[in-house]
Amino acid sequence: MPSVLLADQLEMSLYSSGLLTGVVVDSGCGLTRVQPFHLGRPLRPGATTLEFAGQDLSVYLFKSLFKEDYNRHNLFQLDTVASTQMRKCYVPQNLGDELDFYQNLPDGADERNSYHLPDGTAVELTPMQRLAPEMFFSPQVFGLQGPSLAQAAMDSIEACEASLRPLLASHVAPCGGNTLYPGFTMRLYQLLASHFFPTKASVFAGSNRHFSVWLGASVVAHLSTYKSEWLTKEEYDERFRL
């Protein structure tokens, strides 16, 4: 390896969206973080880390699907939870309206609520199982502490200088696997747009945003402006030679 650059993951995610200034909203398996940037530099007062992420959603589904028999190391259960998350879960635009819709729906009327386990057994999913990603917008409903992801993004922007807030609100970049749930980016946009009106809010959501760190790093690797920040093998040997 001729040279290496240790970089901020959230900064790389920002670059993958083609931005230098904006707010990165990153939610993966173990962490949910919000970080504003201006001209590629992090605005520390707006940095936020939330206490829930994708693993909490998985645990919720494990417990609700398998109850006292749940075992996160059971391959059958792992496959069931992963498939449910990918194929059935989504973010509603309004939780109350969605629950009212399900309440008035006859049993078996919506085939999307049905799921076949790996052994072929048919299971009828409950509304809250399908709406589990609501966790990121209403954590208290699921017994989790702290502000919602959208509120954290609002607070992050509000913590920055007033002159930067309109620019930050109009350049929000969600990334990480949890942001891929259907309805996620639309819900985030609607909440931001409502909060910051009449400032225009915009959400930059690329289709490969679960790989945003890698994509941004690939961009940086080809920029000559960053060459001075790389640590070469010769410099490493000179500085850290035992």
Roles of regions detected by a PLM:
Residues M1-L242:
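C-terminal region/appendage detector
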